[in-house]
Amino acid sequence: MRDKIKLVSTAGTGHYYTTDKNKRNTPHKLEFRKYDPVVRKHVLYREAKIK
């Protein structure tokens, strides 16, 4: 089953992306380097739960 997740910026800006993942195939937490428009740089984004 694909669950919705939130990718939160580690720059502390509060910016996030939403996506989904298959927990059976990827049980670990996702980490991506993506663009943060608040600081105008690519920073590390980590997986968090959507509340």
Curated annotation (Swiss-Prot):
Q: Which Gene3D superfamilies match?
A: Ribosomal protein L33
The record's listing under Pfam families reads: Ribosomal_L33 (PF00471)
Q: Which GO terms describe its molecular function?
A: structural constituent of ribosome
PROSITE patterns linked: RIBOSOMAL_L33
Which keywords appear in this protein's UniProt record, sorted alphabetically?
Ribonucleoprotein, Ribosomal protein
The organism's place on the tree of life at top rank: Bacteria
A Gene Ontology cellular component where this protein is annotated is: cytosolic large ribosomal subunit
Q: Name one GO biological process term.
A: translation
User: What InterPro entries does the record tag this protein with?
Assistant: Ribosomal_bL33 (IPR001705), Ribosomal_bL33_CS (IPR018264), Ribosomal_bL33_sf (IPR038584), Ribosomal_zn-bd (IPR011332)
Similarity field: Belongs to the bacterial ribosomal protein bL33 family.
Question: What's the protein called, per UniProt?
Answer: Large ribosomal subunit protein bL33
